[in-house]
Each structure stands twice: as structure tokens, then as C-alpha cells.
Amino acid sequence: MPKIKTHRGAAKRFKQTAGGKWKGSHAFHSHILGKKTAKRKRNLRKVTVISMADARRLKRLLP
């Protein structure tokens, strides 16, 4: 039986917290930023907790 491979793209983007939740950065903060307000861009810099639906998917990508 071969080893299960880690999805390298997901491994670089998401980290698991000590409590078992997943954290990652917000989307929509790489380009086309001129029309977005300063408050919105400031909030997009923060780290976010991944939703439970996506966390189940991450569990499969990152064994």
C-alpha cells in the first residue's frame, strides 16, 4: 500500500491550530485593489478561521 501524499498547495496555504481548527489568509487581496476601501483591505490582511465545511475537505488533503 503506497503512502498517502500531502497536497502541497494546501499545505503551503493552511495551518492547523492547537485546538484542531484550520487557519488561512483571506481571498480577494492580491490584485484589483483600487476599488476596494482601505477598511476592507485592512481586514483582508488578517488571518481567518476556515469554515467547518472546508475543514472536512482539508482533512483529506492534509492527512
UniProtKB/Swiss-Prot annotation:
Keywords of this entry: Ribonucleoprotein, Ribosomal protein
Amino acid composition bias (Basic residues), ranges on this chain: 1-15
Residue ranges of the region described as Disordered: 1-26
Highest taxon of the lineage: Bacteria
GO cellular component, one term: cytosolic large ribosomal subunit
GO biological process: one example: translation
Gene Ontology MF terms in the entry: structural constituent of ribosome
HAMAP family noted in UniProt: Ribosomal_bL35
Protein family: Belongs to the bacterial ribosomal protein bL35 family.
Protein name: Large ribosomal subunit protein bL35
Native species: Pelotomaculum thermopropionicum (strain DSM 13744 / JCM 10971 / SI)
Gene behind this protein: rpmI
